Amino acid sequence: GIRVENLQNIPGKTEEDEGKINIGAVLRVTPIKDVKTMIQAFGFAKEKDDRLKLWIMGPWEEDREYAEECFQLVSDMEIPDVVFTGRINIRDYLGRMDVTILTSISEGQPLTILESYAAHKPVIATDVGNCYGLIYGESDDFGAAGIVTHIMNIEEIAQAMLDMAANEKMRLEMGETGYRRVMEKYRVEYMQKTYWEIYRDFAEQMGLEWKEESVKLPDKEK
């Protein structure tokens, strides 16, 4: 779950962002995030819509060799408007984004999608882990909060970028859908309640006594 209040009242766009469609990726620059596919897709999309700007936000020191390959790819393809910020405070940047993106080849339930929703931002994501459920909704009828693409599909990802850039109304509606979804289903308080109910039901099935006040976190090691 996520504490939505931590991403309320964050700074919005600046003069630097005027006339730009900012696409933000909050990640570690590692192979599992498939940053190379993201860069290639952005390069093709940028050729068709010069307003696009890609922000790759997060540490790159974990796999320096891969990071250097990503830097070199941007240089070799001569792609303008790609920014590697390094480690950041997400509150300082997320409000400036028009859309966020995740091109991973493997995920569980990505926190970055929930953070985007908390900031009213739509998401482009590959179909890994629970990304499809987060974007299209598993048990609600709120609608789409973004676009899901196939893994490592440069053409699809580029087209998703272009579709988002071309339709401000769609971006805003998807951002609000994501916010509604995270508020209804993925806040920390909701997740705690959901897990408590699961444990309670399991205890009842096993014939065990269950009291909410008996649930305690383990003491920290001294």
For each of these PLM feature ranges, what is it?
Residues 26, 53-68:
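Glycosyltransferase donor-sugar binding loop
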Residues 163, 170-184, 191-197:
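A short, well-ordered alpha-helix in the C-terminal region of glycosyltransferases
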Residues 15-33, 39-42, 55:
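Conserved donor-binding/catalytic core segment of Leloir-type glycosyltransferases
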Residues 105:
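Aromatic "clamp/platform" in nucleotide-sugar-dependent glycosyltransferases that forms part
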Residues 1-19:
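Acidic anion/phosphate-binding donor-loop and adjacent secondary structure
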Residues 67-87:
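Nucleotide-activated donor-binding/catalytic signature segment of Leloir-type glycosyltransferases, i.e.
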Residues 122-125, 130-135:
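Short hydrophobic beta-strand element within catalytic cores of glycosyltransferases
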Residues 136-154, 163-168:
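Conserved acidic donor-binding segment of nucleotide-sugar-dependent glycosyltransferases
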